């Protein structure tokens, strides 16, 4: 698996015109944010060695390199889901490739439902912690040399980014 990650990252590096440090996974309903990215270089997932292909309707299935708010970024327009039949290694493959490309900050978006009657469509939710109930765990198997076997899950999500997102949401 690690060899495939390196192979894919190497293939992308040969084609990348920028070296972004930030990535965004555009979830359901946010694929249109891709139109806000300027100076784009788009690569369909189907062209990328070892990359899964999204089967969800409305997920375009391409990597987009470009600028958003003046910052070099990498965006995934369309992602892969466990419920599509992919295993966790395949679902997490793009994120592992991003790490090999030098991505340091990852924003993940999605559409979700909630039980709280105070929640409204379009409300922004910020995840501060999670419990993994999936039967298959992405850390299962041989450890990659890129990180610890069992990473510290204390403050899994960046406290400063959470605060920044909350402050921006309050302004809007």
Show the residue positions of the predicted features:
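Metabolite-binding pocket within alpha/beta catalytic cores that recognizes anionic/polar moieties
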Residues: 1-153
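Active-site-adjacent substrate-binding region
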Residues: 158-172
């Amino acid at each position: 698996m690690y060899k495939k990650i390196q192979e894919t990252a190497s293939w992308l590096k040969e084609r990348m015109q920028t070296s972004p440090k930030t990535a965004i996974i555009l979830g359901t309903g946010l694929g249109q944010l891709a139109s806000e990215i300027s100076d784009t270089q788009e690569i369909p997932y189907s062209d990328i060695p070892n990359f899964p292909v999204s089967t969800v309707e409305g997920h375009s299935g391409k990597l987009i390199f470009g600028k958003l708010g003046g910052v070099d970024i990498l965006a995934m327009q369309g992602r892969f889901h466990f419920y599509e039949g992919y295993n966790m290694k395949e679902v997490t493959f793009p994120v592992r490739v991003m790490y090999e490309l030098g991505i340091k900050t990852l924003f993940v978006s999605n559409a979700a439902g909630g039980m709280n009657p105070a929640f409204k469509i379009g409300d922004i939710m910020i995840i501060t912690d999670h419990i993994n109930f999936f039967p298959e765990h992405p850390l299962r198997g041989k450890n990659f040399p890129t990180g610890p076997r069992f990473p510290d899950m204390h403050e899994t999500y960046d406290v400063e980014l959470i605060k920044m997102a909350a402050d921006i949401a309050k302004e809007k």
